[in-house]
Protein backbone atom coordinates (compact mmCIF):
# COMPACT_ATOMS: atom_id res chain seq x y z
CA UNK A 1 0.00 0.00 0.00
CA UNK A 2 1.36 3.40 -0.95
CA UNK A 3 1.62 6.46 1.27
CA UNK A 4 -1.61 7.85 2.71
CA UNK A 5 -1.86 11.60 2.45
CA UNK A 6 -3.83 14.20 4.35
CA UNK A 7 -5.75 15.85 1.54
CA UNK A 8 -9.14 17.39 1.09
CA UNK A 9 -12.24 16.70 3.15
CA UNK A 10 -12.94 13.12 4.16
CA UNK A 11 -15.96 11.53 2.57
CA UNK A 12 -18.89 10.76 4.84
CA UNK A 13 -20.80 8.72 2.29
CA UNK A 14 -22.64 6.29 4.54
CA UNK A 15 -23.36 3.82 1.76
CA UNK A 16 -19.69 3.57 0.78
CA UNK A 17 -18.64 -0.06 0.47
CA UNK A 18 -15.69 0.73 2.74
CA UNK A 19 -18.11 1.44 5.62
CA UNK A 20 -17.86 -2.22 6.66
CA UNK A 21 -17.78 -1.15 10.32
CA UNK A 22 -21.43 -0.05 10.31
CA UNK A 23 -23.25 -2.86 12.07
CA UNK A 24 -20.09 -4.96 12.34
CA UNK A 25 -19.30 -7.30 15.23
CA UNK A 26 -15.74 -6.80 16.49
CA UNK A 27 -13.73 -8.88 18.95
CA UNK A 28 -11.37 -7.29 21.45
CA UNK A 29 -8.13 -9.26 21.78
CA UNK A 30 -6.34 -8.48 25.03
CA UNK A 31 -3.08 -9.67 23.53
CA UNK A 32 -1.10 -10.28 26.71
CA UNK A 33 -3.68 -12.84 27.86
CA UNK A 34 -4.86 -14.44 24.61
CA UNK A 35 -2.24 -17.02 23.53
CA UNK A 36 1.43 -17.44 24.42
CA UNK A 37 3.51 -19.03 21.65
CA UNK A 38 7.01 -18.96 23.17
CA UNK A 39 6.47 -20.08 26.75
CA UNK A 40 7.29 -16.82 28.53
CA UNK A 41 3.87 -16.61 30.19
CA UNK A 42 2.63 -13.69 28.10
CA UNK A 43 0.44 -13.72 25.01
CA UNK A 44 2.03 -12.59 21.76
CA UNK A 45 1.44 -11.96 18.07
CA UNK A 46 2.41 -15.45 16.92
CA UNK A 47 -0.01 -16.82 19.48
CA UNK A 48 -2.72 -14.61 18.01
CA UNK A 49 -1.94 -15.86 14.49
CA UNK A 50 -2.41 -19.43 15.70
CA UNK A 51 -5.90 -18.60 16.97
CA UNK A 52 -7.24 -16.46 14.13
CA UNK A 53 -9.13 -19.42 12.67
CA UNK A 54 -11.03 -19.66 15.97
CA UNK A 55 -12.04 -16.00 15.66
CA UNK A 56 -13.03 -16.41 12.01
CA UNK A 57 -15.18 -19.41 12.97
CA UNK A 58 -16.76 -17.36 15.75
CA UNK A 59 -18.06 -15.19 12.92
CA UNK A 60 -16.83 -11.75 13.93
CA UNK A 61 -16.05 -9.16 11.26
CA UNK A 62 -12.79 -7.95 12.73
CA UNK A 63 -10.46 -7.84 15.71
CA UNK A 64 -9.31 -4.98 17.91
CA UNK A 65 -5.83 -5.66 19.31
CA UNK A 66 -4.73 -3.94 22.52
CA UNK A 67 -1.31 -2.20 22.56
CA UNK A 68 1.70 -4.26 21.49
CA UNK A 69 4.22 -1.40 21.25
CA UNK A 70 7.45 -1.10 23.26
CA UNK A 71 6.52 -0.19 26.82
CA UNK A 72 7.87 -0.41 30.37
CA UNK A 73 4.40 -1.79 31.23
CA UNK A 74 3.52 0.50 34.10
CA UNK A 75 -0.01 0.46 32.66
CA UNK A 76 0.02 -2.78 30.66
CA UNK A 77 1.18 -1.19 27.42
CA UNK A 78 -0.91 1.98 27.53
CA UNK A 79 2.39 3.74 28.29
CA UNK A 80 4.03 3.68 24.87
CA UNK A 81 7.78 4.18 24.42
CA UNK A 82 7.87 3.78 20.62
CA UNK A 83 4.82 4.26 18.39
CA UNK A 84 6.26 2.53 15.32
CA UNK A 85 7.64 -0.70 16.72
CA UNK A 86 6.57 -3.95 18.39
CA UNK A 87 7.58 -4.77 21.95
CA UNK A 88 9.91 -7.81 21.81
CA UNK A 89 7.73 -9.55 24.40
CA UNK A 90 5.01 -9.65 21.71
CA UNK A 91 7.20 -10.36 18.68
CA UNK A 92 8.35 -8.33 15.69
CA UNK A 93 6.92 -6.15 12.94
CA UNK A 94 7.08 -9.22 10.68
CA UNK A 95 4.92 -11.07 13.20
CA UNK A 96 2.44 -8.21 13.10
CA UNK A 97 2.35 -8.32 9.30
CA UNK A 98 1.60 -12.04 9.59
CA UNK A 99 -1.35 -11.17 11.82
CA UNK A 100 -2.66 -8.67 9.27
CA UNK A 101 -2.15 -10.92 6.25
CA UNK A 102 -3.62 -14.02 7.90
CA UNK A 103 -6.57 -12.08 9.26
CA UNK A 104 -7.30 -10.64 5.83
CA UNK A 105 -7.10 -14.10 4.25
CA UNK A 106 -9.73 -15.23 6.76
CA UNK A 107 -11.95 -12.22 6.04
CA UNK A 108 -11.16 -10.42 9.29
CA UNK A 109 -10.45 -6.69 9.57
CA UNK A 110 -7.68 -5.54 11.92
CA UNK A 111 -8.09 -2.61 14.32
CA UNK A 112 -5.23 -1.59 16.60
CA UNK A 113 -5.12 0.51 19.75
CA UNK A 114 -3.48 3.93 19.55
CA UNK A 115 -2.61 5.96 22.65
CA UNK A 116 -2.10 9.61 21.72
CA UNK A 117 -3.11 11.35 24.95
CA UNK A 118 0.13 10.44 26.69
CA UNK A 119 3.33 8.48 26.18
CA UNK A 120 5.64 6.56 28.47
CA UNK A 121 8.00 8.65 30.59
CA UNK A 122 10.74 6.56 28.95
CA UNK A 123 9.86 7.70 25.43
CA UNK A 124 12.82 9.59 23.88
CA UNK A 125 10.52 12.55 23.26
CA UNK A 126 9.90 12.97 26.97
CA UNK A 127 13.52 12.35 27.93
CA UNK A 128 14.48 15.27 25.70
CA UNK A 129 11.53 17.43 26.72
CA UNK A 130 12.29 17.24 30.43
CA UNK A 131 16.04 17.89 29.96
CA UNK A 132 15.65 21.67 29.52
CA UNK A 133 13.27 24.42 28.49
CA UNK A 134 14.93 25.12 25.14
CA UNK A 135 15.34 21.74 23.41
CA UNK A 136 13.53 20.68 20.18
CA UNK A 137 10.89 18.76 22.19
CA UNK A 138 10.57 21.29 25.02
CA UNK A 139 6.91 22.02 24.27
CA UNK A 140 5.84 18.50 23.24
CA UNK A 141 4.45 17.83 26.72
CA UNK A 142 2.33 19.87 29.12
CA UNK A 143 4.64 21.84 31.40
CA UNK A 144 3.65 24.46 33.96
CA UNK A 145 5.46 26.65 36.47
CA UNK A 146 4.78 26.20 40.17
CA UNK A 147 2.82 28.81 42.03
CA UNK A 148 4.96 31.34 43.94
CA UNK A 149 4.82 29.12 47.03
CA UNK A 150 5.95 26.08 45.03
CA UNK A 151 2.53 24.45 45.03
CA UNK A 152 0.80 22.80 42.08
CA UNK A 153 -0.38 24.76 39.01
CA UNK A 154 -4.03 23.87 39.69
CA UNK A 155 -6.32 21.34 41.39
CA UNK A 156 -6.44 18.66 38.69
CA UNK A 157 -6.36 15.05 39.89
CA UNK A 158 -5.04 11.91 38.21
CA UNK A 159 -7.32 9.07 37.17
CA UNK A 160 -5.31 6.48 39.11
CA UNK A 161 -5.23 8.52 42.30
CA UNK A 162 -3.31 11.52 43.60
CA UNK A 163 -2.58 14.81 41.89
CA UNK A 164 -2.13 15.15 38.12
CA UNK A 165 1.21 16.98 38.37
CA UNK A 166 4.75 15.69 38.84
CA UNK A 167 7.84 17.81 39.52
CA UNK A 168 10.80 17.67 37.12
CA UNK A 169 13.87 19.20 38.73
CA UNK A 170 15.67 19.55 35.39
CA UNK A 171 13.16 22.17 34.22
CA UNK A 172 12.01 23.51 37.61
CA UNK A 173 8.48 22.81 36.37
CA UNK A 174 5.61 20.40 36.79
CA UNK A 175 4.38 18.14 34.00
CA UNK A 176 0.80 16.97 33.57
CA UNK A 177 -0.20 13.31 33.80
CA UNK A 178 -3.89 12.45 33.71
CA UNK A 179 -3.05 8.85 34.60
CA UNK A 180 0.24 7.63 36.14
CA UNK A 181 3.28 9.85 36.65
CA UNK A 182 4.94 7.42 34.22
CA UNK A 183 2.41 8.54 31.57
CA UNK A 184 3.14 12.23 30.86
CA UNK A 185 0.50 14.03 28.81
CA UNK A 186 1.46 15.15 25.33
CA UNK A 187 0.79 18.74 24.31
CA UNK A 188 -1.60 18.26 21.42
CA UNK A 189 -2.04 22.03 21.12
CA UNK A 190 1.36 21.89 19.42
CA UNK A 191 0.74 21.18 15.73
CA UNK A 192 4.15 19.48 15.49
CA UNK A 193 2.88 16.86 17.93
CA UNK A 194 -0.30 16.47 15.90
CA UNK A 195 1.76 16.09 12.72
CA UNK A 196 3.85 13.37 14.34
CA UNK A 197 0.77 11.33 15.22
CA UNK A 198 -0.73 11.79 11.78
CA UNK A 199 2.48 10.23 10.48
CA UNK A 200 2.09 7.40 13.00
CA UNK A 201 -1.38 6.78 11.58
CA UNK A 202 0.02 6.69 8.04
CA UNK A 203 2.67 4.21 9.14
CA UNK A 204 0.18 1.66 10.46
CA UNK A 205 -2.30 2.17 7.63
CA UNK A 206 0.61 1.54 5.28
CA UNK A 207 1.06 -1.88 6.92
CA UNK A 208 -2.51 -2.81 6.09
CA UNK A 209 -4.35 -1.87 9.28
CA UNK A 210 -8.08 -1.36 8.68
CA UNK A 211 -8.77 1.02 11.53
CA UNK A 212 -7.69 2.53 14.83
CA UNK A 213 -9.22 2.46 18.27
CA UNK A 214 -8.30 5.77 19.92
CA UNK A 215 -7.68 5.42 23.63
CA UNK A 216 -9.26 8.17 25.78
CA UNK A 217 -9.82 10.33 22.71
CA UNK A 218 -11.36 13.16 24.71
CA UNK A 219 -8.14 13.54 26.73
CA UNK A 220 -6.09 14.78 23.78
CA UNK A 221 -6.41 18.46 24.74
CA UNK A 222 -6.30 20.38 28.01
CA UNK A 223 -7.32 23.92 28.93
CA UNK A 224 -4.31 26.13 28.08
CA UNK A 225 -5.25 28.48 30.94
CA UNK A 226 -5.05 25.56 33.41
CA UNK A 227 -8.22 26.63 35.20
CA UNK A 228 -9.31 24.68 38.29
CA UNK A 229 -12.00 22.05 37.89
CA UNK A 230 -15.12 22.81 39.97
CA UNK A 231 -16.32 20.30 42.56
CA UNK A 232 -18.80 17.62 41.56
CA UNK A 233 -22.12 17.33 43.35
CA UNK A 234 -22.03 13.89 44.94
CA UNK A 235 -24.27 12.15 47.45
CA UNK A 236 -21.31 10.40 49.07
CA UNK A 237 -17.53 10.49 48.99
CA UNK A 238 -16.04 8.02 46.43
CA UNK A 239 -13.04 5.80 47.11
CA UNK A 240 -11.09 7.65 44.41
CA UNK A 241 -11.12 11.46 44.86
CA UNK A 242 -10.75 11.84 41.08
CA UNK A 243 -14.53 11.60 40.85
CA UNK A 244 -15.04 14.54 43.19
CA UNK A 245 -14.41 17.05 40.37
CA UNK A 246 -16.35 18.06 37.29
CA UNK A 247 -13.96 17.42 34.43
CA UNK A 248 -14.40 20.75 32.67
CA UNK A 249 -10.82 21.76 31.96
CA UNK A 250 -8.55 18.71 31.95
CA UNK A 251 -10.38 16.89 29.12
CA UNK A 252 -13.15 17.13 26.47
CA UNK A 253 -11.93 20.51 25.25
CA UNK A 254 -13.50 22.02 22.09
CA UNK A 255 -10.04 22.46 20.52
CA UNK A 256 -9.90 18.68 20.24
CA UNK A 257 -12.42 18.63 17.39
CA UNK A 258 -10.06 20.26 14.89
CA UNK A 259 -7.45 17.58 15.52
CA UNK A 260 -10.08 14.87 15.00
CA UNK A 261 -10.87 16.41 11.63
CA UNK A 262 -7.21 16.23 10.67
CA UNK A 263 -7.13 12.60 11.71
CA UNK A 264 -10.19 11.81 9.60
CA UNK A 265 -8.57 13.31 6.52
CA UNK A 266 -5.70 10.87 6.93
CA UNK A 267 -7.91 7.88 7.71
CA UNK A 268 -10.53 8.43 5.02
CA UNK A 269 -12.82 5.41 5.30
CA UNK A 270 -10.45 3.42 7.47
CA UNK A 271 -12.29 3.04 10.73
CA UNK A 272 -11.66 5.50 13.56
CA UNK A 273 -13.25 4.30 16.80
CA UNK A 274 -13.04 6.60 19.81
CA UNK A 275 -13.09 5.70 23.46
CA UNK A 276 -14.79 8.61 25.21
CA UNK A 277 -14.71 8.84 28.98
CA UNK A 278 -16.76 11.72 30.36
CA UNK A 279 -19.94 12.71 32.17
CA UNK A 280 -21.74 13.88 29.02
CA UNK A 281 -21.12 10.91 26.77
CA UNK A 282 -24.10 11.32 24.44
CA UNK A 283 -23.19 14.91 23.63
CA UNK A 284 -19.51 14.08 23.20
CA UNK A 285 -20.28 11.08 20.98
CA UNK A 286 -22.40 13.31 18.74
CA UNK A 287 -19.61 15.92 18.55
CA UNK A 288 -16.84 13.43 17.90
CA UNK A 289 -18.71 11.51 15.19
CA UNK A 290 -20.10 14.51 13.32
CA UNK A 291 -19.42 14.57 9.54
CA UNK A 292 -15.72 14.90 8.81
CA UNK A 293 -14.66 13.59 12.22
CA UNK A 294 -14.52 10.06 13.64
CA UNK A 295 -16.60 7.19 12.28
CA UNK A 296 -17.93 5.96 15.61
CA UNK A 297 -17.42 6.15 19.35
CA UNK A 298 -18.31 3.74 22.08
CA UNK A 299 -20.27 4.54 25.15
CA UNK A 300 -19.61 3.41 28.71
CA UNK A 301 -23.35 3.38 29.39
CA UNK A 302 -23.63 -0.39 29.00
CA UNK A 303 -20.48 -0.99 31.03
CA UNK A 304 -22.38 0.21 34.11
CA UNK A 305 -22.33 -1.86 37.33
CA UNK A 306 -26.02 -2.68 36.97
CA UNK A 307 -28.06 -2.82 33.79
CA UNK A 308 -31.73 -3.33 33.15
CA UNK A 309 -34.23 -2.72 30.38
CA UNK A 310 -34.53 0.98 31.12
CA UNK A 311 -30.78 1.59 31.09
CA UNK A 312 -30.31 -0.20 27.76
CA UNK A 313 -33.30 1.43 26.05
CA UNK A 314 -32.41 4.93 27.20
CA UNK A 315 -28.75 4.58 26.20
CA UNK A 316 -29.49 3.26 22.70
CA UNK A 317 -32.23 5.82 22.04
CA UNK A 318 -30.09 8.75 23.21
CA UNK A 319 -27.08 7.64 21.17
CA UNK A 320 -29.13 7.09 18.04
CA UNK A 321 -30.09 10.66 17.28
CA UNK A 322 -29.08 12.20 13.97
CA UNK A 323 -26.48 10.51 11.82
CA UNK A 324 -24.21 9.42 14.66
CA UNK A 325 -23.27 5.76 14.77
CA UNK A 326 -22.64 4.30 18.24
CA UNK A 327 -20.54 1.33 19.26
CA UNK A 328 -21.61 -0.88 22.15
CA UNK A 329 -19.82 -3.29 24.47
CA UNK A 330 -20.89 -5.08 27.64
CA UNK A 331 -17.31 -5.89 28.72
CA UNK A 332 -13.74 -4.80 28.10
CA UNK A 333 -10.31 -5.00 29.72
CA UNK A 334 -11.13 -2.26 32.25
CA UNK A 335 -14.39 -3.43 33.85
CA UNK A 336 -15.82 -6.39 35.73
CA UNK A 337 -16.93 -9.01 33.21
CA UNK A 338 -20.59 -8.74 32.26
CA UNK A 339 -21.43 -12.27 33.42
CA UNK A 340 -20.44 -11.22 36.95
CA UNK A 341 -21.85 -7.68 36.80
CA UNK A 342 -25.24 -8.97 35.70
CA UNK A 343 -25.18 -12.00 38.03
CA UNK A 344 -25.24 -14.34 35.04
CA UNK A 345 -22.13 -16.39 35.82
CA UNK A 346 -23.15 -20.03 35.98
CA UNK A 347 -26.47 -19.30 34.25
CA UNK A 348 -26.07 -20.27 30.57
CA UNK A 349 -29.56 -19.10 29.63
CA UNK A 350 -29.04 -15.62 31.00
CA UNK A 351 -25.60 -15.34 29.39
CA UNK A 352 -27.07 -16.27 26.02
CA UNK A 353 -29.77 -13.65 26.55
CA UNK A 354 -27.02 -11.05 27.03
CA UNK A 355 -25.31 -12.20 23.83
CA UNK A 356 -28.62 -11.95 22.00
CA UNK A 357 -29.23 -8.45 23.35
CA UNK A 358 -25.81 -7.27 22.19
CA UNK A 359 -26.22 -8.56 18.62
CA UNK A 360 -29.67 -6.95 18.38
CA UNK A 361 -28.53 -3.41 19.23
CA UNK A 362 -28.31 -0.66 16.64
CA UNK A 363 -24.67 0.23 16.09
CA UNK A 364 -21.37 -1.57 15.94
CA UNK A 365 -20.88 -4.14 18.71
CA UNK A 366 -17.74 -5.43 20.43
CA UNK A 367 -17.29 -8.78 22.16
CA UNK A 368 -14.48 -8.91 24.71
CA UNK A 369 -12.35 -12.04 24.68
CA UNK A 370 -13.92 -14.74 26.82
CA UNK A 371 -17.34 -13.10 26.75
CA UNK A 372 -18.41 -15.62 24.11
CA UNK A 373 -17.59 -18.38 26.63
CA UNK A 374 -19.63 -16.83 29.42
CA UNK A 375 -16.58 -16.24 31.64
CA UNK A 376 -17.16 -14.68 35.02
CA UNK A 377 -14.68 -12.20 36.47
CA UNK A 378 -11.32 -13.80 37.18
CA UNK A 379 -10.03 -14.18 40.71
CA UNK A 380 -6.62 -12.55 41.20
CA UNK A 381 -5.12 -12.69 44.72
CA UNK A 382 -3.78 -9.42 46.09
CA UNK A 383 -0.18 -10.60 45.86
CA UNK A 384 -0.58 -11.28 42.11
CA UNK A 385 -2.10 -7.94 41.12
CA UNK A 386 -0.52 -6.01 38.24
CA UNK A 387 -2.99 -3.13 37.81
CA UNK A 388 -1.74 0.08 39.49
CA UNK A 389 -5.29 1.26 40.21
CA UNK A 390 -6.24 -2.02 41.90
CA UNK A 391 -3.04 -2.02 43.96
CA UNK A 392 -3.68 1.54 45.14
CA UNK A 393 -7.37 1.12 45.96
CA UNK A 394 -7.44 -2.50 47.16
CA UNK A 395 -9.87 -4.03 48.06
CA UNK A 396 -12.37 -1.53 46.66
CA UNK A 397 -11.28 -1.77 43.02
CA UNK A 398 -10.72 -5.21 41.48
CA UNK A 399 -11.96 -4.51 37.97
CA UNK A 400 -9.07 -4.62 35.58
CA UNK A 401 -6.86 -7.58 36.49
CA UNK A 402 -9.87 -9.87 36.91
CA UNK A 403 -10.95 -9.02 33.36
CA UNK A 404 -7.46 -9.76 32.01
CA UNK A 405 -6.76 -13.29 33.28
CA UNK A 406 -5.51 -15.74 30.61
CA UNK A 407 -7.96 -17.12 28.06
CA UNK A 408 -9.08 -20.73 28.72
CA UNK A 409 -8.44 -22.86 25.64
CA UNK A 410 -8.41 -26.37 27.12
CA UNK A 411 -7.60 -28.47 30.22
CA UNK A 412 -3.83 -28.35 29.83
CA UNK A 413 -1.67 -26.42 32.34
CA UNK A 414 -2.47 -22.70 32.33
CA UNK A 415 -5.71 -23.66 30.54
CA UNK A 416 -3.80 -24.04 27.27
CA UNK A 417 -2.76 -20.40 27.30
CA UNK A 418 0.94 -20.98 27.95
CA UNK A 419 3.45 -23.76 28.59
CA UNK A 420 5.27 -21.49 31.06
CA UNK A 421 5.49 -22.54 34.68
CA UNK A 422 3.50 -19.45 35.59
CA UNK A 423 1.46 -17.03 33.47
CA UNK A 424 1.83 -13.26 33.85
CA UNK A 425 -1.53 -13.24 35.65
CA UNK A 426 -2.87 -16.36 37.35
CA UNK A 427 -5.36 -18.47 35.42
CA UNK A 428 -8.69 -18.81 37.20
CA UNK A 429 -9.41 -22.54 37.77
CA UNK A 430 -13.14 -21.78 37.59
CA UNK A 431 -12.69 -20.88 33.91
CA UNK A 432 -11.59 -24.41 32.97
CA UNK A 433 -15.20 -25.62 32.87
CA UNK A 434 -15.93 -23.03 30.18
CA UNK A 435 -12.85 -23.61 28.02
CA UNK A 436 -13.11 -23.61 24.25
CA UNK A 437 -12.28 -27.33 24.07
CA UNK A 438 -15.01 -28.28 26.53
CA UNK A 439 -17.64 -26.10 24.89
CA UNK A 440 -16.77 -27.28 21.39
CA UNK A 441 -17.55 -30.81 22.57
CA UNK A 442 -21.05 -29.86 23.74
CA UNK A 443 -23.81 -29.10 21.22
CA UNK A 444 -25.83 -26.11 22.38
CA UNK A 445 -23.04 -24.72 24.59
CA UNK A 446 -22.80 -21.02 25.40
CA UNK A 447 -20.10 -20.72 22.73
CA UNK A 448 -22.16 -22.56 20.10
CA UNK A 449 -25.17 -20.34 20.73
CA UNK A 450 -22.99 -17.23 20.61
CA UNK A 451 -21.70 -18.30 17.18
CA UNK A 452 -25.29 -18.76 16.01
CA UNK A 453 -26.29 -15.29 17.23
CA UNK A 454 -23.32 -13.61 15.55
CA UNK A 455 -24.21 -15.44 12.33
CA UNK A 456 -27.81 -14.24 12.66
CA UNK A 457 -26.67 -10.62 12.92
CA UNK A 458 -24.25 -11.03 10.03
CA UNK A 459 -27.00 -12.42 7.80
CA UNK A 460 -29.58 -9.80 8.77
CA UNK A 461 -29.36 -6.27 7.31
CA UNK A 462 -32.22 -5.40 9.67
CA UNK A 463 -30.14 -6.19 12.76
CA UNK A 464 -26.99 -4.59 11.40
CA UNK A 465 -28.44 -1.42 9.90
CA UNK A 466 -32.10 -1.07 10.86
CA UNK A 467 -33.68 1.64 12.96
CA UNK A 468 -34.35 1.10 16.67
CA UNK A 469 -37.86 1.56 18.10
CA UNK A 470 -38.79 0.79 21.71
CA UNK A 471 -42.07 -1.09 22.13
CA UNK A 472 -42.00 -1.61 25.90
CA UNK A 473 -39.42 -1.09 28.60
CA UNK A 474 -38.97 -1.40 32.33
CA UNK A 475 -36.39 -2.57 34.83
CA UNK A 476 -37.51 -6.15 34.22
CA UNK A 477 -38.05 -6.09 30.44
CA UNK A 478 -37.06 -4.60 27.13
CA UNK A 479 -38.95 -5.06 23.88
CA UNK A 480 -37.93 -3.20 20.74
CA UNK A 481 -38.19 -3.37 16.98
CA UNK A 482 -35.46 -3.17 14.38
CA UNK A 483 -36.86 -1.81 11.12
CA UNK A 484 -35.32 -1.60 7.65
CA UNK A 485 -37.06 -1.09 4.30
CA UNK A 486 -40.38 -2.42 5.54
CA UNK A 487 -38.93 -5.44 7.32
CA UNK A 488 -39.49 -5.59 11.07
CA UNK A 489 -37.90 -7.74 13.74
CA UNK A 490 -39.26 -7.89 17.28
CA UNK A 491 -36.57 -8.33 19.93
CA UNK A 492 -37.74 -9.15 23.46
CA UNK A 493 -35.69 -9.66 26.63
CA UNK A 494 -36.88 -10.65 30.09
CA UNK A 495 -34.54 -9.30 32.79
CA UNK A 496 -36.96 -10.03 35.63
CA UNK A 497 -38.41 -12.92 37.58
CA UNK A 498 -41.87 -13.01 36.02
CA UNK A 499 -43.03 -14.26 32.61
CA UNK A 500 -43.90 -11.72 29.88
CA UNK A 501 -46.81 -12.25 27.49
CA UNK A 502 -45.87 -11.55 23.86
CA UNK A 503 -48.87 -13.11 22.15
CA UNK A 504 -50.39 -9.77 21.17
CA UNK A 505 -47.42 -9.03 18.89
CA UNK A 506 -47.99 -11.97 16.54
CA UNK A 507 -44.79 -13.91 15.94
CA UNK A 508 -45.03 -15.94 12.75
CA UNK A 509 -41.31 -16.66 12.34
CA UNK A 510 -39.03 -17.07 15.34
CA UNK A 511 -35.39 -16.53 14.37
CA UNK A 512 -33.80 -17.17 17.76
CA UNK A 513 -34.91 -17.78 21.32
CA UNK A 514 -38.21 -19.16 22.49
CA UNK A 515 -41.57 -17.96 23.80
CA UNK A 516 -43.80 -20.96 24.43
CA UNK A 517 -47.42 -20.06 23.93
CA UNK A 518 -46.35 -16.48 23.39
CA UNK A 519 -44.90 -16.30 26.91
CA UNK A 520 -41.29 -15.22 27.52
CA UNK A 521 -39.87 -16.87 30.63
CA UNK A 522 -37.50 -15.08 33.06
CA UNK A 523 -33.92 -14.69 31.82
CA UNK A 524 -34.81 -15.51 28.23
CA UNK A 525 -35.17 -13.72 24.91
CA UNK A 526 -36.90 -13.86 21.55
CA UNK A 527 -35.99 -12.52 18.10
CA UNK A 528 -38.82 -12.87 15.60
CA UNK A 529 -40.09 -11.49 12.33
CA UNK A 530 -43.17 -9.35 12.83
CA UNK A 531 -45.99 -8.49 10.46
Where on the chain are the PLM-derived regions?
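Short catalytic/ligand-binding loop motif for oxyanion handling, primarily in non-cytosolic enzymes
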Residues: 71-75, 118-125, 220-224, 280-284, ...
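Loop/helix patches that line or flank the sugar-binding groove of alpha-linked glycan CAZymes
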Residues: 2-5, 19-23, 225, 230-248, ...
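Acidic/aromatic-lined carbohydrate-recognition and catalytic surfaces
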Residues: 2-202, 206, 219-280, 407
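Solvent-exposed beta-hairpin/edge-strand motifs
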Residues: 505-513
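Surface-exposed beta-strand/loop patches in extracellular or lumenal glycoproteins
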Residues: 495-506
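Hydrophobic residues within beta-strands of alpha/beta enzymes
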Residues: 63, 212-214
Amino acid sequence: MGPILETGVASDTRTNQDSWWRGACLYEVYLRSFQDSDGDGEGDLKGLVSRLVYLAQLGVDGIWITPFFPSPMFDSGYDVADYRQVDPRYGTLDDFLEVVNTAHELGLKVIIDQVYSHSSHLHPWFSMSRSSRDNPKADWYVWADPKPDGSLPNNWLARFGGVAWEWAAERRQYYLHNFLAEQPDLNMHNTKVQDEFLDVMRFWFGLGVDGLRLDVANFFMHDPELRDNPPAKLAETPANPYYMQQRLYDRSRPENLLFLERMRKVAGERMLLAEISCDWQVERMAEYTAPGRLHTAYSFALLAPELDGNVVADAVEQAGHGDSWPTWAFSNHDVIRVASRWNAAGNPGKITMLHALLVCLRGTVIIYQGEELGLGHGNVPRGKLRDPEAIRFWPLDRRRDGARTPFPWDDNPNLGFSRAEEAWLPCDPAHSELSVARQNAVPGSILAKCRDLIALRKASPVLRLGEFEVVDQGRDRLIFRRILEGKRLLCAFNFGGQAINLSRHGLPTVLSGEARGGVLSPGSYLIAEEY
